[in-house]
């Protein structure tokens, strides 16, 4: 248990990070809405940007039961076995990128003018405490990764636990239920909008993870992120997290007595098959902060509106579900001013009940990109176990999507 003084100091730090980012994230002035096409973007938030990253290509390799291969321009890791084996495979296959990636928490803290050396021991103590609320296997995987990277494991604890402190992301999600898609199956579009700090866009990848005795899943991430921020498992359960900046329920913005949400989301993919099972796990796990979680299985789509106090469930508006960076449920919402949310609504109106193709979902995601911040975009198809992805310097929504067929990969074929 951490001392009250340490808790107060960490909370003060979180308020500094949260306050600056919230001011940066004020929505832009209203602009005319555009029809469903490759439209000009909504003006991006005034968030801290990063210089363009130079091109990078991973070295294809195998290690034990793990491998790193390319599908088109997309690097795909396959990791399997025990937590220790998965950690070792990640460390060896991603050895050239882990050192700069592990510097990212430091860069984020310094971005706000804070003293990293002063805060690191506090952040490490908090992260270690929070990880104690998650399954032990996740810490074992991080410890193994650190061992074979010759890195300090505390860097991984912080990277996977204290992302809840930052509020510098945007992100958008657009889910179309089977009755409104041309294919008759769920489609789940998602943009990940975040400053790249010169590394996140360069090293983005698809990670196919086959944990011993658990559901296999795909995570769209970077090496070293043991938790999940965007992913889908072999049962067709898909999810993606989106920052939230305010809540009406009186809950604290940050509760250190919760489990890191990214690790909880991974646990959901490893242990759950349906939205209802995911909800049950989320409700029984202590939560750290405010967050939206877009989630669907093959038949149902919801937004979990998460606070340390409760888990709200928002259902589709008709056959469509849109989500950005605010709550919508009456007991949680604190005003809706996001232009991206409004743009997605206008695009739905423009379709006037017609069915969406995959290309049109892609165009919807392009219509709400945030310029340099949008360095990952994807569309999940849970029924056919496919993910269509594009990475790279933003806006990556203007790039063609590469399909990754997941069924055989999940089965180890």
Locate predicted features.
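N-terminal secretory signal peptides that target proteins for export/translocation
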Residues: 1-5
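Alpha-helical interaction segments
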Residues: 7-8, 128
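Bacterial N-terminal signal peptides
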Residues: 8-18
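C-terminal, well-structured catalytic/ligand-binding subdomain of enzymes
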Residues: 27-148, 178-187, 191-413
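Gly/Pro-rich turn-and-neighbor structural signature
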Residues: 145-189
């Amino acid at each position: 248990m951490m001392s009250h003084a340490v808790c107060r100091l960490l909370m003060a730090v979180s308020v500094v990070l949260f306050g600056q980012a919230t001011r940066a994230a004020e929505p832009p002035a209203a602009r005319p809405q555009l029809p469903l096409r490759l439209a000009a973007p909504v003006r991006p938030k005034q968030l801290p940007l990063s210089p363009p990253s130079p091109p990078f290509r991973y070295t294809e390799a195998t290690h034990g039961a793990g491998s790193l291969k390319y599908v088109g321009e997309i690097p795909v890791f396959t990791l399997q076995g025990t937590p220790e084996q998965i950690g070792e495979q990640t460390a060896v296959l991603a050895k050239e990128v882990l050192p700069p990636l592990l510097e990212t928490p430091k860069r984020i803290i310094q971005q706000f003018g804070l003293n990293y050396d002063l805060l690191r021991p506090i952040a490490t103590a908090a992260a270690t405490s929070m990880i104690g609320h998650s399954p032990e296997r996740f810490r074992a995987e991080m410890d193994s990764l650190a061992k074979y990277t010759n890195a300090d494991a505390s860097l991984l604890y912080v990277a996977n636990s204290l992302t809840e402190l930052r509020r510098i992301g945007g992100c958008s999600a657009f889910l179309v239920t089977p009755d409104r898609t041309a294919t008759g199956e769920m489609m789940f579009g998602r943009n990940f909008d975040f400053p790249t700090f010169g590394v996140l866009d360069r090293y983005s990848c698809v990670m196919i993870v086959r944990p011993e005795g658990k559901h296999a899943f795909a995570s769209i991430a970077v090496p070293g992120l043991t938790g999940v921020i965007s992913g889908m498992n072999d049962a067709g359960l898909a999810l993606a997290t989106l920052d939230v900046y305010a809540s009406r329920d009186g809950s604290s913005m940050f509760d250190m007595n919760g489990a890191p949400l990214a690790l909880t989301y991974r646990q959901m993919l490893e242990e759950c098959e349906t939205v209802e099972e995911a909800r049950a796990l989320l409700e029984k796990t202590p939560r750290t902060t405010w967050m939206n979680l877009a989630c669907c299985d093959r038949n149902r789509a919801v937004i979990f509106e998460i606070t340390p106090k409760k888990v709200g469930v928002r259902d589709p508006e008709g056959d469509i579900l849109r989500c950005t960076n605010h709550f919508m449920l009456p007991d949680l919402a604190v005003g809706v001013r996001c232009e991206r949310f409004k743009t997605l609504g206008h695009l739905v109106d423009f379709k006037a009940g017609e069915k969406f193709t995959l290309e049109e979902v892609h165009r919807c995601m392009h219509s709400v990109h945030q310029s340099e911040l949008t360095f990952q975009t994807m569309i999940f198809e849970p029924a056919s176990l496919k993910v269509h992805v594009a990475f790279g310097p933003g806006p990556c929504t203007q790039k063609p999507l590469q399909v990754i067929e997941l069924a055989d990969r999940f089965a180890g074929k």
